[in-house]
Amino acid sequence: RLYLSDQVTTIDMSRYIGELIGDLGSSMGPDWAAAIETDLDPVCIEPGRAITIGLILTELIINAQKYAYGGKPGPLRIAFQEDGAFFRMTVEDEGAGGHLAGKGFGSMMIKSLVGQLDGTIDYRDRAPGLSVVLRSRIDPLV
């Protein structure tokens, strides 16, 4: 859904994430799509960083689908907010909990992508559920 041209300098993350979630919801089915709630600030990010954030979000949503509710639909909240010079993306479920960062390919990929953003990611078991918070600068340090 992210179409780039030489003129694109920033991506509105509220629109990009909304479209990404819509596409993922379509592939996961209507019950999953209906269970996703969003709170998305219109934060503008340069395209390369937006793509990286989208990959992280996609992996977190897939993990919630697989582990939080045993493959069945359940509430999933996604927020993207501006926090001064930083953004904060939160993905929360109300599922089984306890599925913190693993050692599989998806977890390694997320760790690598977070490193590309020079950001941090925090997994918190909410018992029930899991909260994952990604935080990084809106603009990269040059």
Give the label of every model feature segment.
Residues 75, 86, 97, 126-133:
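Glycine-rich nucleotide-binding loop
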Residues 1, 10-27:
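Short beta-to-alpha transition helix within the HATPase_c
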Residues 99-125:
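ATP phosphate-binding glycine-rich loop and adjacent ATP-lid/helix-beta elements
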Residues 82, 86-108:
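Glycine-rich/acidic phosphate-handling loop/turn and adjacent ATP-lid/helix
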Residues 6-17, 49, 53, 57, ...:
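The cytosolic transmitter module of two-component sensor histidine kinases
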Residues 73-81:
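A conserved short beta-strand within the histidine kinase catalytic ATPase domain
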